[in-house]
Amino acid sequence: MADGVDHIDIYADVGEEFNQEAEYGAHDQIELYEDVLSPSANNGDAPEDRDYMDNLAASVGDDVVKGSVPNIVYTYTGKRIALYIGNLTWWTTDEDLTDAVHSLGVNDILEIKFFENRANGQSKGFALICVSSESSSKKLMDLLPKREMHGQKPIVTPCNKQFLSQFEMQSRKTATQAGQMSGEGKAGPPGINARLPFPPGGRGRGRFPTSGPGGDRFPGPAGPGGPPPPFSAGMTPPRPPMCPPGPPGPPGPPPPGQPLPPPLPGPPNRGERPPPPVMFPGQPYGQPSIVTLPPGPPPPGYGPPPGPPPPQQGPPPPPGAFPPRPPGPPMALGPPPHLPGPPPGGPPPAPHVNPNFFPPPGNAGMTSSDSRGPPPSDPYGRPPPYERGDYGPPGRDMDVVRTPLSEAEFEEIMNRNRAISSSAISRAVSDASAGDYGSAIETLVTAISLIKQSKVSADDRCKVLISSLQDCLHGIESKSYGSGSRRRERSRERDHSRSREKSRRHKSRSRDRHDDYYRERSRERERHRDRERDRDRERDREREYRHR
């Protein structure tokens, strides 16, 4: 019976499956290779989209061997060529990049992705652009590096792991240098704070999706124009001069490997103003400042960033032109102590300087003991504590400083005080006779305070008026207290009667409870005694029974 059944050969298709694995094994290995290398090249970021990475070998043509058949099965029919565009400022938007590409005659943009920092969404300074034709990619490679975008010339490279890692390393180096420069007090990125909001229409809000791997930010130029100069591992950023600078000299050549900076624009128009220089305490007014803030990205609605600040207006004044001013709190970038201070009537510091740490130059009337700076032993430059005696409320000593009054003014104020006193006394007496003691007392207190606040309160005649008002006040208060005591006595009598009634009720209740309690106790005792008697009788019976 078993011989008649057709046996199913479960090993019949093993050979085909092994052949299929051999056929598609290379594809699986390529995908695994891409997955392994993506985190190391992107510094832990998400891997790139594989739809253009798979077409990389066919589009670039640098790793393709002629005559070899690719093992990858392509599902995307259209052509897609990806390029990296780097050396961009962090405030460059996708619209800026799109306009620059369209100006070259390239209109087949498929996608633009900016590489952003996942922590704060700030651009790293390079982006990925996808076009659909080989001619467009060649135009971008040849013509786009010649165009300037926000004062910098972009760099266009093929889309592969090598250039991606180079751009990532460059963004990390620039971020580290910017952190060192900001830690030393020098503003590297365009603006004091690197966490400024993006201008409207920026990345992520344009016409293209902007999701991309994160990383460190790519700050913009350190000056009015060109890119920040790179520093080697053993070098530190240049320190500013610690003396008043002279007229600006011609700019030096750019460092190797960087494009030429753009020509500096002319002075600003009538509607524009350059950023104000930072004012430090102890710096002469009108003297060129040591550190001038570079222009940052354009604020919303103000167009491109303005030009550089104009050259300084003339040489610095001689040291004896202004009276000396005590030095303020020491800073990392403060001026040398031999510089004279601003004049006493000069303007306060610039609005972006905290006035709590940089006092305005209007304190020339202070004594020499109070106007000294902080002691040199204080490493943080904290100012000495203020003496509260100068800021306390005015006391009796202020009466001496008051200007003397003329006879007419004195008589006018005295007549006014007399009228206030007489009207207050008459009104208080009428209110007290009507039984409204509160209104009478309030009227007299108000009149006394008004006369005490007048300019002639120290005169003897004013003191007589005040004493008469106070006597009237004491009399009305005694009457109000007497009537109140009578009322209180009556209320006390009522309260005593009520409390007596309550106490009687309570005592009667407590007595009843006490009697009930004792009755219950006596009953319990009687029951207990009865039980004891019964037990004794039982014991006696048992003894009698045993003796028999």
Swiss-Prot record:
Pfam families: RRM_1. The keyword Metal-binding does not apply. Its main location: nucleus. Transmembrane segments: none annotated. GO terms for molecular function: mRNA binding. Residues 221-279, 294-362, 373-384 have a biased composition (Pro residues). Residues 501-511 have a biased composition (Basic residues). Residues 169-180 have a biased composition (Polar residues). Keywords: Cytoplasm, mRNA processing, Nucleus. Residues 169-401, 473-548 are annotated as: Disordered. Residues 81-161 form the RRM domain. InterPro entries: CPSF6/7 (IPR034772), CPSF6_RRM (IPR034769), Nucleotide-bd_a/b_plait_sf (IPR012677), RBD_domain_sf (IPR035979), RRM_dom (IPR000504). Component of the cleavage factor Im (CFIm) complex. Component of the cleavage factor Im (CFIm) complex that functions as an activator of the pre-mRNA 3'-end cleavage and polyadenylation processing required for the maturation of pre-mRNA into functional mRNAs. CFIm contributes to the recruitment of multiprotein complexes on specific sequences on the pre-mRNA 3'-end, so called cleavage and polyadenylation signals (pA signals). Most pre-mRNAs contain multiple pA signals, resulting in alternative cleavage and polyadenylation (APA) producing mRNAs with variable 3'-end formation. This is Cleavage and polyadenylation specificity factor subunit 6. It comes from Xenopus laevis. The lineage of its organism: Eukaryota, Metazoa, Chordata, Craniata, Vertebrata.
